[in-house]
Amino acid sequence: MSPMNAFDPQAEDSTTTIGRNLRSRPLARKKLSEMVEEELEQMIRRREFGEGEQLPSERELMAFFNVGRPSVREALAALKRKGLVQINNGERARVSRPSADTIIGELSGMAKDFLSHPGGIAHFEQLRLFFESSLVRYAAEHATDEQIDLLAKALEINSQSLDNNAAFIRSDVDFHRVLAEIPGNPIFMAIHVALLDWLIAARPTVADQALHEHNNVSYQQHIAIVDAIRRHDPDEADRALQSHLNSVSATWHAFGQTTNKKK
């Protein structure tokens, strides 16, 4: 019997089939806090409470929804995680606009869990490669003189940090952050910041001396990327970026293998 015939009132076994389908799809019960959260979220999205406006007090919300204080507090906490409200001690929740950082931050826990699984780091490194490849191509085609100057300044700080691994990591992140800023898209920035945070947190601990050569190689590759962007050559910028990130990936993979052997 086809899916359409399964719900044909003329079909001989339609009642049995419908009953079987309903039994196989039990309705999920929602917590009171989830229902309060959904209703408040809809009210905010319908502009019944404008940005910056305070929501009713907990006591008023308890009376309005006929629920207890824990349900109201759980609902408000969920709205805060979504970036829809701000909660300060002693004050009523205030409606806010979710930022790109808030949206990406919601994925942080899942991303870190994914990174801990076999192949997780490789998948995120591939994501970074695809993402930054587009960024450098855009930069080579559209970067202004002022934006190229910012890249050059980030590169200079990079060069001054070669012998200080903590400082080099910061300058390295800042260099790539400038690339992510060039399109002027806040979502790109939020994705880029989170992506680097996740990957750096997943890297193994390595002795400072082992990182010095890696720092210098990365710096030289950064120079190649900036030179290609300055010449407005997207193909060369892309090649330089891919060479750089593939090198970084291989280096940290080797560091990880060495660390595992020592355990």
From Swiss-Prot:
Q: Which PROSITE patterns match?
A: HTH_GNTR
- Leader sequence residues: none
InterPro entries xref list: GntR_C (IPR011711), TF_FadR/GntR_C (IPR008920), Tscrpt_reg_HTH_GntR (IPR000524), Tscrpt_reg_NanR (IPR023730), WH-like_DNA-bd_sf (IPR036388), WH_DNA-bd_sf (IPR036390)
- The set of disulfide-linked cysteines is none
Q: Region Disordered: start and end of each range? A: 1-23
Q: Name one Pfam family in it.
A: FCD
**What is an annotated GO biological process for this record, any one?**
negative regulation of DNA-templated transcription
The name on file for this protein is: HTH-type transcriptional repressor NanR
Q: What is the lineage of its organism?
A: Bacteria, Pseudomonadati, Pseudomonadota, Gammaproteobacteria, Enterobacterales
